[in-house]
Amino acid sequence: HHAIMNVLEPVFEKQFIFHTYACRKGKGSHKAIKYAFCKAKNCEYFLKLDVKKYFENIDHNILKRKLSKILKDKDCLDLLFDIIDSFSIEKGLPIGNLTSQFFANLYLSELDHFVLEQLKPCGYCRYMDDFILFSNSKIDLKKMLNSIESFCLNNLLLTLKPYILGKCKDGIAFLGYKITCKDVDLLRISKKRKKQKLRRINYEFENYFISKAKYIERVKCLFSI
């Protein structure tokens, strides 16, 4: 899977907006948090959304159509389709596979473009299936919510978890941190998650799933902001 994505990553990159931060070189959760903090300082309201059981509900036919639009090599497509169907026939991707991370990121890229080009909030960022919109109008965000729910259901066959719409000054829980217009604090619950992630990184390194350089990079990323 790593060899496949080393070749295909540049092709996928061309589909992504600037402010989507998962599974991309030079991005990551901490840059997503910094962007959200910047917007929280300059916008009054936020709308936080999350896809319900995202990986489990990725539709294979829709994903394959998206891949067919950006890749023209039949052998390559056949290989990717086999990987997709190896988990189940109609929908769902295994969370642990590297290809699944890229497929999942690509699946929502159409939504990213819809939000930025059609809805035009004051700010927008996405980390996999967690995303935030910013605006100075609560009414505008409610309208955007309706549009996004319809887009996800009709175009992607996805539904959203209950939304959170609030004032930035009251704080935004995002990727294990509480972001306000003044500062960024680590959520208490995320300390336990950090330990779990560290154990996972150590396991992957000790069992030769990742290189030493990648191990160091991920540990630094985990404990820095």
Residues of each region from the PLM?
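Conserved polymerase palm-domain catalytic core
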Residues: 18-19, 24, 33-34, 38-128, ...
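Hydrophobic recognition helices of helix-based DNA-binding modules
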Residues: 11-12, 115, 152
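Active/ligand-binding-proximal structured segments within catalytic/core domains
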Residues: 3-8
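Short, well-ordered loop/turn and helix-capping segments at boundaries between secondary-structure elements
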Residues: 137, 154, 180-184
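A common structural junction motif
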Residues: 149-157
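Acidic (Asp/Glu) carboxylate-rich active-site/surface patches
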Residues: 28
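Right-hand nucleic-acid polymerase module
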Residues: 2, 142, 159-225
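Charged boundary/loop elements
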Residues: 10, 14-19
